[in-house]
Amino acid sequence: MESSTIEIVGLHSSRSEHDPLTMNALVCTASALIVAVSISVAAPAGNYPSLPSKVLSNYTPSKVDSHDSETMANRANAFLSSLDKKLRAQAALPLNSPEKPKWTNVPPRGPQGGVRLGDLNEKQLETACDLLATVLSPQGYGKARNIPLADDRLLRNGQRRPGFGAEDYWLAIFGEPSPDTPWALQFDGHHIAINLAFHGERMSMSPTFIGTQPREFQLGGKKIVPMEKEAPTGLALFQSLTGSQKKKATIRPKRANLVAAAGRDGFVPDPLGLSCQNLKNEQRAILMNVLKSYVGDLPGAHAEYRLKELRTEIDQMRFAWWGPGEKGGDFSYRIQGPSVIIEYAGQDLGGDPHNHLHSMYRDPTNEYGARLGKKAKD
């Protein structure tokens, strides 16, 4: 498998006119309003607001020669070995722990779902970064690193605020990391919930929530954009459609919200929008780019395997659009097929629909790695 070098690259809903209002949307809306009135888009002055902020800002994870099952399991075990007894008890949970589906993107997070980054020392944080950079691609690690740093910009003058900032993110490992037997990893907090499952040389990433606020920020003189591709690739797909295709794809002239986010495991929305069966080759290529902006969070060969699966499902997929179809517009979209649900929605708080973003990736046939065991036997 490929050698990789880590390169750093660049939540809250409101009621939709078409989609059902879920409990998650209510909670997200309330949280979003709290954030909207307190956001400070300037980077914290002077020193870092927390040790996790310092480490995430400055530490470059060590390289790995491959992203095979043995390397991933070794990195997970190295992280667990770095913890004392108390912290390890928080981080290491049974494979089928009831905490696994309790992930949330809404602050504050309860203490049961893993070890808190703010409770780790510098070496432990670096080992956690090494682990995340091994089980994710550079694109995926960039999100896992940059979303907590973006959340630092929501702190009031850089001061501690429960549920916000890089120190209030949680890392959990379910089961015993092994190159042969099932185990899982969860990294969650405000605007992020990554659920990875492993079984032999197969892995999955469902369900995964990715969001950010603000959309971009400055770090070390560089512009960081945690969600760089999700909006432009989706917009490019919509703009590639013919007039009649756009009419079929468009559900409402107003942006909708996520309907398959936190607390919605097992929910499959009704397929809406344009059938992708008659897309031209150029449009199919753009659709694959949209899928890659999500699936590409998986490391190399795992992303390629998943994209190959999805390519065979294009004829069964639907593409739905809400809102205006121009750059900067307050829009949302959904791509849905037999084994994929992808949702994207801006939140339009403070008059900028792209400064607060939500997205969701699910494989309803493989939630928390449900079908990995079967694949391992095939």
Functional labels for PLM-detected ranges:
Residues 4-5, 9:
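Intrinsically disordered, low-complexity segments enriched in serine/proline and basic residues
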Residues 15-30:
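Bacterial N-terminal signal peptides that target proteins for export
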Residues 29-40:
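Bacterial N-terminal signal peptides
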Residues 43-378:
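A cross-kingdom marker for long, charged
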